Design a protein with these regions (language model features):
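Structured interaction patches on ligand/partner-binding surfaces of diverse proteins
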Residues: 51-101, 193-227
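Tryptophan-paired
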Residues: 3-58, 125-210
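Structural motif
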Residues: 1, 116-126
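Hydrophobic, glycine-enriched assembly/anchoring segments
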Residues: 215-247
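A short, Gly/Thr-enriched small/hydrophobic beta-strand-prone motif that recurs across taxa
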Residues: 105-119
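Residues that act as N-cap/strand-start positions at coil-to-secondary-structure junctions
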Residues: 28, 86, 98-100, 109, ...
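Catalytic micro-motifs at enzyme active sites that drive phosphoryl/nucleotidyl and oxygen chemistry
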Residues: 31-32, 101-103
């Protein structure tokens, strides 16, 4: 969805306005018009939200969060990737005698993790794969300050698709923003999870390949699991740039 949802909070952090506009409406009306009393306000905006994301406790800025609908439903393993969410915030001061234009600049609130698996057997049917990849300790929720709720962690199962031309399994999981120092793990197992072939500590992988996701507007990470005759290895993927960032 290209909708933008704007939240306006007063100086006490109370929600005083909420507006949702489509991209077309924003272009046609050149933004969102707000008529606010004199005072100081915090603007928070999110875009690309779908039914897969829920907003909770939006009435108070200090408590407002958004996160995976599957997490809020209590699913122990989340099978749907997070939305490709972008986030913007700004503090403004309103004086009635002035008309002001304020611009919000959006930052990426998610980091795509691209997973490739090479050398695994082809699926017996389109609906079955002999392997599964779990991403462990991903944050299922973010605060309205654009930071993940670090105390909350979930398991996301990558939805692997088989590429008959290359023989690879590929998937993308949109993780909410995390830091270079993290405890995220990628686990490659057989279907059902009884046998774990390989576990990659993402922080170690990022350090080994000089990958940083901090202080960047946009970032993505790609990792390839490769089966050989005796073991499974984890590599920085050549199919996609391992880290791509616009500063």
């Amino acid at each position: 969805s290209d909708n933008v949802t704007l939240f306006v909070y007063d100086s006490d952090g109370n929600l005083v306005a909420r507006r949702t506009k489509s991209g077309a409406d924003l272009q046609a009306h050149k933004g969102v018009n707000l008529n606010l009393p004199d005072g100081n306000y915090s603007l928070v905006a999110w875009t690309n939200l779908t039914d897969g994301t829920e907003i909770h406790d939006a009435e108070q800025l200090s408590k407002a969060v958004l996160g995976s609908a599957a997490y809020y439903a209590g699913d122990p393993i989340i099978h749907h990737e997070n939305d490709r969410v972008y986030f913007a915030t700004k503090k403004i001061t309103v004086v009635q005698s002035q008309f002001r234009d304020e611009e919000l600049l959006f930052d990426q609130a998610h980091i795509p993790l691209h997973v490739h698996v090479t050398g695994a057997a082809a699926p017996a049917t389109r609906a079955t794969a002999p392997i599964e990849v779990d991403i462990v300790n991903l944050h299922p929720q973010m605060g309205f300050d654009g930071a993940s709720t670090s105390a909350l962690k979930s398991v996301y199962r990558a939805q692997l698709a088989y590429d008959a031309e290359t023989g690879d399994y590929v998937a993308r999981v949109n993780a909410f923003r995390f830091l270079n120092d993290n405890d995220i793990q990628l686990k490659l197992s057989n279907s059902g999870g009884e046998i774990c072939y390989k576990t990659v500590e993402l922080a170690d992988f990022m350090n080994e390949h000089a990958i940083s996701v901090e202080d960047k507007d946009e970032a993505e990470i790609a990792i390839r699991f490769r089966f050989n005759n005796t073991s499974v290895e984890g590599h920085r993927s050549d199919t996609k740039i391992g880290i791509h960032a616009k500063v």
